[in-house]
């Protein structure tokens, strides 16, 4: 089929680059790790490690025992294999550590005592909070001196080098899972980031730090908690631990690393099949022949697989990728390829859910809307089958909210109107697309979601508001210059500066970054608080939010697929992890 171009009517342009992925490359992906023998080896390793975990954790009570348990939990999580050991992690590690926990942190010798080991306390606090145990950040105040600096409580040469850096790294990672109003966490984060940056620069008060530990420090500084997605973290730590020869002297560490590599490769084989399916679906849909829409199906699938990689969530990943593609087609159409008159007709078509309203529009719009209606209706059929009840209204209403927000933006652009900051944010949260990107996959998870659960995770709900808000701000912070060039004058930055004409761009950026940071703390709370929402649902929403921060860290990774983005995708989707014989 020949590619279809736009009509001669003058229209704005998005200046999007084309598809950077060769379909032949995607369809050539082939891994031997789908063979049953590898799955059998995986199960054998899991059982061996479970036995070793019980052996490793059957030690005399004391600080070393507590740290050992916490280090094992941290390693399993960093390598992305903790799901195989959920029972052991809770009963043999976290429940045990919590029995020693008090208002000052981990007990030493008895529960009522106080351990002066910052590394143990920070590791324990982070692990317990992430697993929703009730722990207070106030324990970290015990490690501040009279000058407000955090200390490790080592003496002499013992305090130089690895132990001190390890303690500060643990404190940094603990400080990142803060809740609103926890001042000590803000202080700890600022202090440790400055300290560890000095270490990386070769300055400060420590010398001769282990290179593998420095790699961990570099990763933590480059990819904080909200910018670190599970698959990228696992892939990175496979390399970090793989080069740590002293760490590999332990038998259990060797087996954990081997399991993590095998697990990654087996899962990657499944992910190959999914991205190949999405690529065929995209090619066969006909929409791929419209040469002015962004072709980002590989990037969208990579986004979701970096966040939600487990084998049981295949349908949700595919639904997410399809939904993201629909959002992009609509985004490009409303932003740059349709007139305001056409946009109003398209919006009315979605309001009434009547495709015939677009009959008199250009062919490229009709093709796009046929693709949109067909895909949404197909997803609704899958959702109804999974949930066992009619979900048509909730899905369509979510799409209508999304489309209405685009119409509002188009009207602002057409009239040159710059809304108030609050008006922009409210509409921008809807136009982020996170509502529908979150809803479709959630409804295809292996969970029945009754109305009382949906009310807590769908619009209007606090966790969805925060997903939309943090996504919108992260997008704006990276895109405002590009969008200004395309004529999209309304962004959170410009709206804020219009209301505050005395503000500089730097001040406006700092204000908006402050909103983002506070919102991420609230996001932490909504994710980790105890409620009736299935954890897989909250985890999906939270990790998609982390994925957005990852994507927008250095660039708009969905708008610009540069070499670094391609390299990341190759490491996750294309290249296998080398296995030692």
Curated annotation (Swiss-Prot):
Keyword Metal-binding belongs to the record: yes
Residues binding Mg(2+) 3: 475, 483
Pfam families linked: Terpene_synth (PF01397), Terpene_synth_C (PF03936)
Residues given in the record as Mg(2+) 1 binding sites: 331, 335
Pathway: Terpene metabolism; oleoresin biosynthesis
Catalytic activity: (2E,6E)-farnesyl diphosphate = (1E,4E)-germacrene B + diphosphate; (2E,6E)-farnesyl diphosphate = (+)-delta-selinene + diphosphate; (2E,6E)-farnesyl diphosphate = (+)-guaia-6,9-diene + diphosphate
Gene Ontology cellular component terms for the protein in this record: cytoplasm
Annotated keywords: Cytoplasm, Lyase, Magnesium, Metal-binding
Record EC number: 4.2.3.71, 4.2.3.76
Cofactor list: Mg(2+); K(+)
Places the protein is found: Cytoplasm
Family of this protein: Belongs to the terpene synthase family. Tpsd subfamily.
Function: Involved in defensive oleoresin formation in conifers in response to insect attack or other injury. Involved in 34 sesquiterpene (C15) olefins biosynthesis.
Miscellaneous note of the record: In sesquiterpene synthases utilizing farnesyl diphosphate as substrate, magnesium is more efficient as cofactor than is manganese.
Domain-level remarks: The Asp-Asp-Xaa-Xaa-Asp/Glu (DDXXD/E) motif is important for the catalytic activity, presumably through binding to Mg(2+).
Name recorded for this polypeptide: Delta-selinene synthase
Lineage, top ranks: Eukaryota, Viridiplantae, Streptophyta, Embryophyta, Tracheophyta
